[in-house]
Amino acid sequence: ETFSHVFGETLRQLAREDRRVCAITAAMADGTGLTGFAREFPRRFFDVGIAEGHGVAMAGGMAKQGLIPVFAVYDSFLQRGYDMLVQDMALEKLHVVLAVDRCGIVGADGETHHGCLDYLSQIPGMTVLSPASFAELRQMLRRAVLEMDGPVAVRYPRGGEDGYEGDCGDESVTVLRQGTDAAIVTYGILTQQALRAAELLEKEGISARVVKLNRVAPLDSSGICRALDGVKRIVAAEDQLRAGAVGERLGALLLELGAGTEKLVLRSVGTTLPSQGSTVELRHALGLDAEGIAQAVREVLA
């Protein structure tokens, strides 16, 4: 089972519950998990072809007419519609749901498909949710479609779960593991790697707290401060390019709030787009596997 499959099945259930729910794809019905939706709801399924910008603009128009459009699209392809994301969706605060597949390092799909630019977090009024498990994808998509207002993006990776199967509920920030020496702040598919890193460090006598962000934009300042209370040394781990991503925004937030953070180490994709390679290979090369994150904690404590 994959995140794409779980998305498609969940959206079909939501469409059964609310006739306003519609699905949009840009020539990627199979890849995004929408083939079942298209068969069950042919009049509520729209394929705009290889025209992601048009898909966003069309979703905005549908939202203005009272529908609930869900645009399922690969992260790297949605970049083409950035102007429409701002002008035809965010500017008017329209309730469009973006189901953003292939976020982060994608491995087998190749270097053109990496979703490592955190561009959605820069759009005013955009809420960005980041599930780390199938259960979280189900509940986050349900909330995004039926309970939330304005533009919402649910970002999830290629493939299946990485070992973490929890469900954060509607919390924006969750402490998954207590610790006193340092904190690892992460989100999405890297959650399990962070938990494994904390286990490795425990064997060395290092107590690492693991803080999971479920909503990566806007950041929940009060929730983050509560989660990091008492810890002064922090590692932020994410499979995104560093510029404008969670790590940089977290650092600015903690500084602005005077949280007393003594040292922050950012573990990210860095400043260069990832090359070809498997997910395991690329995580290891970038220091985003369990051992790499553990090493970042050692550095922040040095």
Predicted regions: what is each one?
Residues 51-65:
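Small-aliphatic-rich amphipathic alpha-helix that forms the alpha element of a beta-alpha
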Residues 60-61, 84-86:
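Histidine-anchored nucleotide/phosphate-binding helix
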Residues 1-10, 16-39, 47, 53-56, ...:
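Thiamine diphosphate
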Residues 65-77, 96:
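Glycine-rich phosphate/pyrophosphate-binding loops
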